[in-house]
Amino acid sequence: IRDRASFLFDYGRGLHKQQQFSKSNRILKEALQRSCDPMILNVIGKNYQQMGDCLSAEDWFIRSTHRLPGRIYPYYLLAKLYAEPSFRQPDKFEKMKRMVLTKEPKVHSTAIRQMREEIKKIQLIFVHIKKDE
């Protein structure tokens, strides 16, 4: 069963990369029946975000934070979602930005550093938008 979950995740992620978001979600939701890997939740959320359903994306990313609260990645995904022009939520962005920048990672990595750098760049855009308002 575990191998099947891994296969379904890889297949669903491949469909995501091919921009087949609805089909990817169907496969990934099947994978959820066999695995509690939070990355499944993250990819489902990213699919919804790509389809323009930001509320569903938010729900799936939040579920991922609940599954493994120590992971920084879903907070990063939420911060980016809250920075989307069509879903802009500065207060929620600030909260997620703080999580990304201050949460102590289990392992320091290039990925963590890159996420933090990107969030800082997004923050600069928010500062400019606030000045223009």
Short names for language-model regions:
Residues 6-10, 39-43, 73-77, 109-114:
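Alpha-solenoid helical repeat scaffolds
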Residues 21, 54, 88-90:
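TPR-repeat structural position
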